[in-house]
Regions:
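Walker B motif beta-strand of ABC-family P-loop ATPases
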Residues: 267-269
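Phosphate-coordinating catalytic segments in nucleotide- and nucleic-acid-processing enzymes
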Residues: 2-4, 44-265, 328-341, 347-366
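Conserved D-loop-proximal element of ABC-family nucleotide-binding domains
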Residues: 275-279
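Pre-Walker A-like glycine/lysine-rich segment at the N-terminus of P-loop NTPase domains
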Residues: 1-45
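Walker B catalytic acidic pair
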Residues: 271-273
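Short loop/turn elements that form and flank the Walker-type P-loop nucleotide-binding site
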Residues: 17-18, 262-264, 293-295
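C-terminal lobe/lid and adjacent interdomain/linker elements of RecA-like ASCE P-loop ATPase modules
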Residues: 73, 280-366
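Short amphipathic C-terminal alpha-helix that caps PH/PH-like domains
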Residues: 39, 244-247, 289
């Protein structure tokens, strides 16, 4: 899968060729999350073909003001994001020319300006005291132009933590889509019922560590028992919520891809899935990533060398190093596996090395 991003947040221009499983390594604040956001942004409008109550775009890309998307707020530039394979392409352009313009696959994205958008599910951005939202009466024509649909997910527990935990402990908040976990987790209860293996796998691991057990109730609530006593949500480790969220996300993406015949057209981005996660869950995480990679593409940000080693032991992983160049822009370079092997360089070594030291181990820098 080829990805090209220009003038998006910290990214002036990068080009990448991603494998079925791609891991982004690099120092903090290098701009790795901006790569995941760009992929989510370019594929966001396909969601209008599948369900109504969509996740807010502004939360996915962490921007309510459209000018936040432009590198250094330079509105003379054009945000350009292209994601695709030989079978499909999503090419998004955002620019200002006598006002805001959005183009997707060379077709104009129909939107309207409002002082206050009446239907919040159509909201895109704000700018200049106005709100921009999709024009529902004209959007069906754009979907026809796109042809075969693409589905992408950006699962980041820390990004949506409050909504995720609230949905798990209090029950389903939003029912759509029924087969695929939302990034904000608001349909967790409905989706998790069709992924019973996740609950079993998590409980099997917990049984080895303690007498803690997870139960999914009929109303979609998650209840965690410690020595047969229901725990208060505030006493439950985030690690339990995180692994449930990530595994249900991956498993549901596999299910949804097969259900809708979307093989090769589904992307799951994982933002630091290992954060605050019990290391004992890593094998399950790798297992679910491997299974989804048979039908779609996985892009992972991680700072954990153990997870990277497990992935590389079991899967053909494409490794990219993400760093800040001399101009302060995000740049990327693919790590050369042969060079890493020759010099006995591990993932842990890379995380502690300076960019100039890592770049000599790369194929080429963008």
């Amino acid at each position: 899968m080829e990805v090209s991003i220009s003038h998006y947040k910290s990214i002036e221009k990068v080009q990448m060729k991603l494998g079925r499983v791609t891991v982004l390594l690099g120092s903090p604040a290098a701009g790795k999350s901006n790569v995941l956001e760009a992929i989510a942004l370019a594929t966001y409008f396909d969601r209008y073909a599948f369900y109504v109550d969509r996740e807010p775009l502004s939360r996915l890309v962490r921007a309510t003001d459209v000018s936040d998307l432009f590198t250094f707020y330079d509105l003379t530039k054009t945000v350009e994001i292209s994601v695709g394979t030989g079978e499909w392409r999503r090419s998004l352009r955002i620019y200002f020319q006598q006002g805001l313009r959005l183009e997707l696959n060379d077709a104009e994205v129909p939107f309207a300006r409002y002082f206050k958008l009446p239907n919040r599910s159509l909201y895109l951005f704000s700018y200049g005291a106005r709100e921009y939202g999709i024009d529902p009466d004209r959007f069906s024509k754009l979907l026809e132009v796109l042809g075969e649909k693409v589905v992408a997910r950006l699962y980041g527990f820390d990004r949506f933590k409050d909504d995720i935990i609230n949905s798990m402990v209090n029950g389903v908040k939003v029912e759509a889509p029924q087969g695929l976990l939302r990034e904000d987790g608001k349909n967790f209860g409905i989706v998790a019922k069709k992924q019973p293996k996740v609950i079993r796998d998590v409980n099997t691991e917990l049984a080895e560590l303690s007498r803690v057990e997870v139960k999914l109730l009929d109303d979609g609530r998650v209840v965690v028992f410690d020595n047969d006593i229901a725990m208060k949500p505030s006493a439950i480790s985030d690690s339990v919520f995180r692994i449930l969220y990530i595994l249900v996300g991956l498993s549901s993406a596999t299910f949804y891809t097969k259900l809708h015949g979307l093989e090769g057209r589904t992307i799951v981005s994982l933002e630091e899935p290992e954060g605050q996660l019990f290391p004992q869950f890593f094998n399950h995480l790798v297992e679910y990533i491997a299974k989804f990679s048979e039908v779609g593409y996985v892009v992972i940000i991680t700072h954990n060398p153990i997870l990277v080693s497990l992935l590389r032991d079991k899967l053909n992983v494409t490794l990219y190093y993400v760093y800040r160049g001399d101009g302060g822009f995000t740049e990327v370079a693919e790590l050369d596996k042969d060079k890493l092997a020759e010099e006995l360089i591990t993932s842990e070594d890379i995380l502690f090395m300076k960019p100039r030291e890592v770049l000599r181990l790369c194929r080429s820098a963008s």
